[in-house]
Amino acid sequence: MSSFLRALTLRQLQIFVTVARHASFVRAAEELHLTQPAVSMQVKQLESVVGMALFERVKGQLTLTEPGDRLLHHASRILGEVKDAEEGLQAVKDVEQGSITIGLISTSKYFAPKLLAGFTALHPGVDLRIAEGNRETLLRLLQDNAIDLALMGRPPRELDAVSEPIAAHPHVLVASPRHPLHDAKGFDLQELRHETFLLREPGSGTRTVAEYMFRDHLFTPAKVITLGSNETIKQAVMAGMGISLLSLHTLGLELRTGEIGLLDVAGTPIERIWHVAHMSSKRLSPASESCRAYLLEHTAEFLGREYGGLMPGRRVA
């Protein structure tokens, strides 16, 4: 056995991955219920084993070095395999004693906790953990075996994964209630050709849907402002900075309070699909399989119940 393997411990890898995820020794210590000096000592011991620095500070921000980034990929996979081994042994027990880590695409955070609360009520003994991120993050977590299931929009065709549709995912055009076309019915998208569009960053799910819409309607917006989150876009829409295309499932609160209004553009809502995915090579534990089955059976009904009343006379799920 090499000196590297003799000196390396799973605890060191767990602490390293937690620090990397939070980009903070303090927050990692809080999650792991350790003191900050204990966390720092374990990372220093790991750096001694590796023989290279794993973290550095750039403009006051804790970031991974190149060796640290490489190790993070392997450490995540190792810890994922250990988790799988533990769950495989637990599989001979009861589904109620398992654990699940589910990855949520950012847009789904508006409804997924309430949806999953129904699952945890049925299976109170299951340890459910949630990881949230953008599409790129979820793809990496799936590939690294760091999550069991992923709830996302576009299926992960980049990976050898199993992806199953679970519900409709409508996207709608929204504006301030003070917009001149707020009360217009079934007007053409070209009526918005002079408007400023507030969109997510290129590569995000909602940005991709917007670009498809523009292409299909031979439409070029007068101006596009790129914003980094749905929350920022919603605040900008409320302030009258422009209009946006967003998932209906991000707008429950604002539509109910009247702070944001729907634009009744012909051809909307634009329907996409929610999917639940896992790696083809992954053997789902009884708890994970139970959660997958729950999402397949209940998501469409749940979303229809929660959001169906927000678009009178228009199908949303």
UniProtKB/Swiss-Prot annotation:
GO-annotated molecular function: DNA-binding transcription factor activity; transcription cis-regulatory region binding
Domain annotation HTH lysR-type: ranges: 8-65
Positions of the DNA-binding region: 25-44
Pfam families associated with the record: HTH_1 (PF00126), LysR_substrate (PF03466)
Keywords: Activator, DNA-binding, Transcription, Transcription regulation
Matching CDD domains: PBP2_CbbR_RubisCO_like
PANTHER family the UniProt entry points to: HTH-TYPE TRANSCRIPTIONAL ACTIVATOR CMPR, HTH-TYPE TRANSCRIPTIONAL REGULATOR
Function: Trans-acting transcriptional regulator of RuBisCO genes (cfxLS) expression.
Similarity comment: family membership: Belongs to the LysR transcriptional regulatory family.
Protein name, UniProt field: HTH-type transcriptional regulator CfxR
